[in-house]
């Protein structure tokens, strides 16, 4: 089912959707310009940009109860996250800025039965003057350390239960009223105990399975006592129809059926804690990744990148403490901390992290020009902390030379952080060339566009590995802020991520060769795709492509000779249209408009043209998909 109404969720009627329908070029511009008719139509949005209605409702309740005059609030998943947010606010607005922090938690389960559907949920609420709220929202967006919509719904439900119990306690006369309140509490119990179909006790096992899939790129069969009995599901496959991705609610946590076979786990719990798994790199680069000590899960992909950046800054702080009597406890935010390097034109919030939480060299071309610029920086004697790079980049699908970066890293003692969200675990093996690999699990790993999460993998052979392991165990290091229901949903969605990735690779190859490549020089000025962007990109990508099942992925970008043809093409695409990528259904957006509307001239210097349309290919029937693009081409050309 295609979302066609401005502001509805993608997929339609999906409570926890991570994309929103902006079906025309004009609607996307209207969204960026803040047109009230567009903004008021939004039912959802990408979670770091659009505060979900459940989170808004929770904040309104807490604000009504705890805020002071002219204060606004936002919820965060832990006190440590809230404290980092407070630090960011004070750095950006001044030390005198008033920031209040309130810690809250829901009740713990009282017995073994309650553990099936109840979990103590701790959140921290940050209160600031309303005029400071946009700065706090920046932290939420850039850091990705957020409260999920499922977590907010759980807290709202617990608040409702508590409220009903309190009402019952306050009624001390009138049997009629007491009976009504008792009935309400009984109804709440039944809804909570039997209405929730996710077993909270399985959350830790679900997280282990996710980490293991990331470590091994293999989905193993779930044993008879595992998660396969907890829920079934149906997500996109060809039998659902060429563009039918379900009715909406079925993509959430309700009754779902699957013809994807469950798979078996041979080691769990205590036995799994010491297990390691072989990465499928080339023979001379083989090493083992332990899913329990080398793989970490986060509430978003940006949170994993933000944590990698924090880890590196804390490492640099050790250098500074040894070399000076520095009293300032502030970590990052510019000198005397070393600069990082952003290699290539990245997703917007990655660059924001490097700029707003420290300082950075932005080498936006991401090619030999940028490599020469990096070498000039290194040859000048400047010591850099780390190079951040996407593999490949979004939206230009450029691939930097990871082998050369690794050589320079060893020579000049800097670290490499790779975001391989676009390439994906199945298609590329970048860990041998990186110290840290980050990824958004919201994308192809999940596919169903109904949960947000991220991962960070430490290279056991990396130069910073020992420090990183220790840092992750410190008070300021790693916290597991991935809510249990999100983990259960992600585990379910990712059971077939390998097969889906292979199918997407095939669909994209067919679409490009059969329909789009013949239009280069006619309608399209250029197609950006790892095998097409440039000879250097193809060579660099091929050097890290997985030997088993690897392909070029499902993301490509199109540029046009004139913007009117771009608008006609986009408006006539009979597809879901909105932000995000890696969905099981094909998704398109005018990327420069939606991501860089306030800086179109600046990003054009790096090749991100205003007319650029980004497409993320899904699992639809390839013939149907080709016909959809062919019709849009004909409309754009006036045929």
From Swiss-Prot:
<feature type="modified residue" description="N6-(pyridoxal phosphate)lysine">
    <location>
        <position position="443"/>
    </location>
</feature>
<keyword id="KW-0486">Methionine biosynthesis</keyword>
<dbReference type="Pfam" id="PF01053">
    <property type="entry name" value="Cys_Met_Meta_PP"/>
</dbReference>
<dbReference type="GO" id="GO:0005634">
    <property type="term" value="C:nucleus"/>
</dbReference>
<keyword id="KW-0539">Nucleus</keyword>
<dbReference type="InterPro" id="IPR054542">
    <property type="entry name" value="Cys_met_metab_PP"/>
</dbReference>
<comment type="pathway">
    <text>Amino-acid biosynthesis; L-methionine biosynthesis via de novo pathway; L-cystathionine from O-succinyl-L-homoserine: step 1/1.</text>
</comment>
<keyword id="KW-0808">Transferase</keyword>
<dbReference type="GO" id="GO:0009086">
    <property type="term" value="P:methionine biosynthetic process"/>
</dbReference>
<comment type="function">
    <text>Catalyzes the formation of L-cystathionine from O-succinyl-L-homoserine (OSHS) and L-cysteine, via a gamma-replacement reaction. In the absence of thiol, catalyzes gamma-elimination to form 2-oxobutanoate, succinate and ammonia.</text>
</comment>
<dbReference type="InterPro" id="IPR000277">
    <property type="entry name" value="Cys/Met-Metab_PyrdxlP-dep_enz"/>
</dbReference>
<dbReference type="GO" id="GO:0003962">
    <property type="term" value="F:cystathionine gamma-synthase activity"/>
</dbReference>
<keyword id="KW-0663">Pyridoxal phosphate</keyword>
<keyword id="KW-0963">Cytoplasm</keyword>
<comment type="similarity">
    <text>Belongs to the trans-sulfuration enzymes family. MET7 subfamily.</text>
</comment>
<keyword id="KW-0028">Amino-acid biosynthesis</keyword>
<dbReference type="GO" id="GO:0006790">
    <property type="term" value="P:sulfur compound metabolic process"/>
</dbReference>
<dbReference type="InterPro" id="IPR015424">
    <property type="entry name" value="PyrdxlP-dep_Trfase"/>
</dbReference>
<protein>
    <recommendedName>
        <fullName>Cystathionine gamma-synthase</fullName>
        <ecNumber>2.5.1.48</ecNumber>
    </recommendedName>
</protein>
<dbReference type="GO" id="GO:0019346">
    <property type="term" value="P:transsulfuration"/>
</dbReference>
<dbReference type="GO" id="GO:0030170">
    <property type="term" value="F:pyridoxal phosphate binding"/>
</dbReference>
<dbReference type="InterPro" id="IPR015422">
    <property type="entry name" value="PyrdxlP-dep_Trfase_small"/>
</dbReference>
<dbReference type="InterPro" id="IPR051750">
    <property type="entry name" value="Trans-sulfuration_enzymes"/>
</dbReference>
<dbReference type="InterPro" id="IPR015421">
    <property type="entry name" value="PyrdxlP-dep_Trfase_major"/>
</dbReference>
<dbReference type="GO" id="GO:0005737">
    <property type="term" value="C:cytoplasm"/>
</dbReference>
